Amino acid sequence: MRRFDFLSDNIGYMRRIVCKKGGGFLYLHEQSIMSIVGARPAARAVLRGDEKHPGLRGYADFFPYRCGTVVIAELWGLPQDPGPCASNIFAMHIHATGDCTGDMDMSFSSAGGHYNPKNCPHPAHAGDMPPLFSNRGYAWQGFYTDRFTPWEVMGRSVIIHAKRDDFTTQPSGDAGDRIGCGVILGLR
């Protein structure tokens, strides 16, 4: 069984994603999604945790699709707050620089700020992505965006933050410490 075969039963709500560019409409259907995620991605970030989160690992794949990108992310080893009401939600952003080094004050500080080529306020940065919902330390998500193509983000980094993004606080959503990082590299 391919890793994305299970999507066919759970994708009804994504039967149609509409994107208007250049006067035309784009309809993304189940068959299109299956052909996208079954192909080799154009780019991938292999993620690792910082010194406080050495078990954090994962990847984010970037697939070109029409006027944007399908992103598939899978992570494991995310920190967990105990209790039945803990949110365990983590912000995930593309940052401007493809450098996962840091300093004593901040892990992965060399990644810079959010990728924001049009100088938009948060949460309209091109690098703002949906949050990760962790389930006992594991998270998987897939989404479509027209904010960037895979080629526009190659050489940049994906950062996982310790908290959820509040989608309000400027300049970056009060998402907390940087706990994971991976440089986006081209694969084709």
Residue ranges, per PLM feature:
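N-terminal leader/targeting pre-sequences
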Residues: 2-188
